[in-house]
Regions:
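HotDog/MaoC-like acyl-thioester-processing domains
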Residues: 1-9, 63, 80-128
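Hot-dog-fold acyl-thioester-processing enzymes
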Residues: 1-82
Length: 128
């Protein structure tokens, strides 16, 4: 049974994450960027010269890992579904940086017996 108090009060601490240009390029390559070597729109994400980070890379930086597997949550992690994700950027993500992430559970809604719950987790990234 889900332990709502343990989930809602989960302390992730501050997560410091350093990534380099190589990481930025590998992320983009993993998305299929650069498959067409003549597509200049994609080359900016995989080539060192004037390298840019794919904006969605922010969704994987500063992750607290798979914390739902912690028995203290009471969650049946095998049945978890990632339902949706939202991203707000206030400036471009640097191609290389050290960031600090703060993760927090901002809401949890019980859908009823045997139907699970919806949890909203927020992650804020800032320059260190």
């Amino acid at each position: 049974m889900l332990n709502y108090d343990a989930v809602r009060q989960r302390d992730f601490g501050r997560i410091v994450h350093t990534y380099a240009q190589r990481d930025t390029m590998l992320y983009a390559l993993g998305l299929g960027m650069g498959a067409d070597p003549l597509d200049e729109g994609e080359l900016r994400f995989v080539y060192e010269k004037e390298l840019q980070a794919v904006p969605t890379m922010a969704t994987v930086l500063g992750s607290p890992g798979f914390w739902w597997k912690d028995p203290a949550t009471g969650a049946d992690w095998v049945k978890l579904v990632h339902g949706e994700q939202d991203l707000q950027l206030f400036q471009p993500l640097p191609a290389a940086a050290t960031i600090v992430a703060v993760n927090r559970v901002v809401a949890i809604t019980d859908k009823g017996e045997g139907k699970g719950a919806i949890a909203v987790i927020e992650r804020e990234l800032r320059d260190q």
